[in-house]
Amino acid sequence: MAAKKLKILFVTSEIVPFVKTGGLADVSSALPQMLSELGHEVRIVIPKYGAVDDRKFKIHEIVRLKDLVVKIGDKDVMFSLKSCFLPGPRVRVQIYFLDNQEYFGSRNGLYVDPKTGKDYPDNDERFILLSRSVMELIIKLGWIPDVIHLNDWQCGLIPAYIKTLYKDQESFDKFKTLFTIHNLAYQGEFPASTFKKTELPKELESVSKGIMHNGKVNFMKSGLMFADVINTVSQTYANEIRTKEEFGEGLKDVLAKRKDSLYGIVNGIDKNVWNPEKDKQIPKTFSAKNIEDKLVNKKELAERFGLAYDEKIPIIGLISRLFDSKGFDLIQKAFNDLMKL
């Protein structure tokens, strides 16, 4: 029996080739394309930051998604949702861009102000708007997804909205939410005064049953509490964050309560991009059939970084930020064994 073809709404705060700060942007591009190739109907929602080029990507207005209004605390905030297709060689995946000049269009930084190096002070309002815009998108389009796939704290309020503020909305009981933890260390923590801005019901302004944590509103906790299913990047990590304080980032107990709904799924790669046999970004393509050609790339890498080249001495290049979460401690532990290979 063939697997059911799903309608999937994928919500993210960054995506290649439009904007990127980390691996989330790569996943947000590759996964929807692969799901679409498998026959699912996938649509994406993302903020339209100032760095996104309308003309280059042919982003256009949608009349019925123009000049919508939601409340953020005492403010009426107007926004529109524009659209284009995710550039890809095989499938066309539709993207909806949340367009608001004040919160997104006037800023090139995604979360951090490039001028100060600090988080934007209104990040709470910015991503409240993202959450509310997703609700309004579904209502206005009448396109009811089977699954809403949410990524990291920036999307964490959406499950809470679905189960409270929008619970009586027609057809909102028909879809399920999947919340993916990409980086548990970043939780979207804001002052208690942020709660009023969310418009969520008073009962969620608690620690035991709501979105408060250590005296602050915690967007990540909201996603963990109210999503139907949670996943993270490996089964080992999924076990660690719910059983060990050093991995749980203060949310171990919350995750432990959701253990039956918490899964580990290892990220894959797009073999059409990460394929040395046809990669245009490396000096010399190679494959298992002509592995010796890899030495050309090794020599080029050594020269680029001013290293003495020796065919017999290994060079390891990593595309990564230098954070503990990237597993550099594992390389350190295995280093002596690696050198014996």
Language-model features, listed with the residues they occupy:
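Catalytic cores of nucleotide-sugar-dependent glycosyltransferases that transfer UDP/GDP/TDP-activated
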Residues: 1-341
